């Protein structure tokens, strides 16, 4: 910092009249002692001591207070002189009554001088003011106060001198001590101020350095930004120049392209005009040619179409006639076949009626014989085995309904059965077979089946022969099986007459060898042990051993006398 600032900011020195300091208190005490010995109190009126005391107190207060203006001091002296005036006037009136002498006037002047000298000990200012006041009062011809002479001894003056010497010495020492203290305090304050200023200076330097660094950073950033801006400006100017060049090129290209399109449009319009002109000429020429050749061309086309249509019609008529003849011949054949089939159906229906009646009669006879001799017969002949029977052709007949369509179908089946061999039906169905035990409900509702086995050499007669019958408890529960065996000798005359009359009747209506009728009741569910016991009872096993030989003889005789066995099976 500069020297001017240090001078302005110098510390303020303490006042010499501060209360509580050592110098001021010592001086005050010495000053009081001086007033005791040096001040001579004149003998005034009763009010003068109080006024003098007040005046001295004001002087003391003025010493300890701040210095006042000279105008105020003069006003105080005037007030003091005016207050003393009435007392002086009172004394003067008393003296006028007695005229003064010259000695008395000299005494008064000496007292006045001593008074003024005593006042000068207090303060030269006040003494001057009083002298001025006295002069003014003398000038105004006011009588002065008569003060009696105050004698001061020499001892007191010596004491005052000693006291003043002591006071001046102590004042000097105290003033020097205070000055040294002030100097030290000033130096310390100056050092502290310098230290604070150095710290502030260092802080300011650091702040300024940081600001300088920041400003340098900002400067660098501004420089880089300015460089970038310059680059951007240069790039933009370069781009603008290129864009201007491009725009110029585009402008020239568009002008050239517009000229080219205009030229092409003119060429195209010219070509269209030429094409239109040619088309109009061609249309006119075609109309003229068409009007000339239209009549001849139409006639020729009509003749050609008519000829082609006639040829097609002739071909179609020939084809249809050939197809019609073929269909007529086929229709005649079909009608002849229908007539033949109808005749065959009539014959078949007659033979079926005869066979059905024979079966019904045999069934009735067997049923009557079964119910009559059921309890009397205990033994029976066992039926022959399946292996001993000779295979013979068999025909299966199905009971036809009454309608004509089914009769024709059954007649056709009979013809096919005559020409094709089928398996032989056995003459006897064993009573203990599994069919009697586990037959289903569908078999219970099946229609009647008639099986016939014929031979070309012999025809059995209608003579009834005795036949064995077996009825078991199982058969009585599950269903009823009626086995009928009819044996007859061949009747040659009857066979020859039937062969000569009709082959179909001979094949269909031979004498019946055996009829098997089954009447099934609802099937009962049995266990395996019950079915085995029902299949092989004890009575059947015992009778099979006793009748084995006789059955073999009978089977041999039957095989000799019978060429075939016919069986009818009726299922209710």
From Swiss-Prot:
Repeat region (Centrin-binding (CBR)), residues: 143-174, 232-263, 264-296
InterPro entries listed in its UniProt record: POC5
GO biological process entries: centriole elongation; eye photoreceptor cell development; negative regulation of centriole elongation
Localization: Cytoplasm, Cytoskeleton, Microtubule organizing center, Centrosome; Cytoplasm, Cytoskeleton, Microtubule organizing center, Centrosome, Centriole
One cellular component term from this protein's GO annotations in UniProt: centriole
Feature: compositional bias, Polar residues: 89-101, 395-418, 542-562
Protein purpose: Essential for the assembly of the distal half of centrioles, required for centriole elongation. Acts as a negative regulator of centriole elongation.
Family indicated by similarity: Belongs to the POC5 family.
Protein name: Centrosomal protein POC5
Organism of origin: Xenopus laevis
């Amino acid at each position: 910092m500069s020297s001017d600032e240090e001078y302005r900011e110098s510390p303020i020195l303490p006042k010499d009249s501060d209360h509580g300091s050592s110098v001021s208190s010592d001086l005050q005490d010495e000053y009081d002692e001086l007033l005791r010995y040096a001040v001579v109190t004149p003998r005034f009126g009763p009010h003068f001591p109080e006024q003098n005391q007040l005046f001295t107190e004001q002087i003391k207060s003025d010493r300890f207070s701040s210095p006042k203006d000279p105008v105020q001091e003069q006003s105080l002296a005037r007030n003091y002189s005016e207050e003393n005036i009435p007392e002086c006037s009172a004394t003067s009136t008393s003296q006028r009554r007695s005229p003064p002498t010259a000695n008395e006037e000299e005494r008064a002047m000496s007292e006045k001088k001593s008074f003024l000298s005593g006042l000068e000990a207090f303060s030269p200012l006040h003494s001057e003011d009083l002298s001025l006041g006295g002069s003014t009062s003398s000038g105004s011809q006011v009588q002065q106060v008569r003060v009696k002479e105050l004698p001061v001894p020499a001892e007191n003056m010596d004491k005052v001198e000693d006291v003043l010497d002591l006071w001046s010495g102590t004042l000097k020492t105290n003033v020097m001590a205070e000055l040294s203290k002030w100097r030290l305090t000033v130096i310390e304050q100056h050092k502290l101020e310098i230290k604070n200023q150095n710290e502030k200076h260092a802080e300011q330097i650091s702040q300024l350095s940081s600001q300088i660094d920041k400003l340098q950073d900002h400067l660098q950033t501004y420089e880089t930004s300015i460089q970038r801006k310059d680059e951007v400006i240069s790039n933009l100017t370069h781009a603008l120049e290129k864009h201007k060049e491009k725009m110029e090129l585009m402008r020239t290209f568009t002008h050239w392209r517009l000229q080219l399109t205009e030229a092409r449009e003119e060429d195209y319009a010219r070509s269209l005009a030429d094409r239109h002109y040619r088309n109009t000429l061609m249309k006119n020429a075609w109309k003229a040619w068409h009007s000339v050749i239209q009549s001849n061309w139409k006639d020729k086309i009509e003749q050609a179409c008519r000829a082609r249509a006639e040829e097609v019609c002739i071909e179609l008529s020939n084809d249809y006639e050939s197809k019609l003849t073929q269909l007529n011949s086929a229709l005649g054949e079909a009608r002849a076949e229908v007539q033949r089939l109808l005749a065959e159906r009539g014959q078949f229906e007659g033979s079926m009626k005869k066979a059905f009646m024979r079966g019904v009669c045999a069934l009735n006879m067997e049923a009557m014989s079964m119910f009559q001799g059921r309890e009397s017969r205990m033994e029976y002949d066992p039926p022959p085995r399946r292996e001993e029977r000779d295979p013979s052709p068999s025909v299966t007949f199905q009971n036809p309904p009454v309608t004509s369509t089914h009769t024709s179908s059954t007649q056709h089946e009979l013809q096919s059965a005559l020409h094709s061999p089928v398996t032989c039906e056995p003459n006897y169905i064993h009573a203990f077979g599994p069919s009697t035990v586990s037959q289903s409900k569908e078999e219970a509702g099946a229609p009647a089946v008639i099986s016939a086995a014929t031979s070309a050499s012999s025809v059995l007669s209608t003579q009834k022969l005795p036949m064995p019958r077996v009825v078991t408890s199982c058969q009585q529960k599950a269903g009823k099986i009626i086995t009928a065996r009819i044996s007859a000798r061949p009747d040659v005359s009857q066979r020859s007459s039937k062969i000569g009359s009709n082959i179909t009747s001979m094949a269909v209506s031979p004498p019946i060898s055996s009829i098997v009728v089954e009447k099934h009741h609802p099937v009962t569910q049995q266990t395996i042990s019950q079915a085995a016991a029902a299949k092989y009872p004890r009575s059947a096993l015992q009778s099979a051993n006793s009748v084995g030989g006789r059955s073999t003889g009978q089977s041999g005789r039957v095989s000799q006398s019978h060429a075939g066995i016919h069986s009818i099976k009726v299922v209710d």
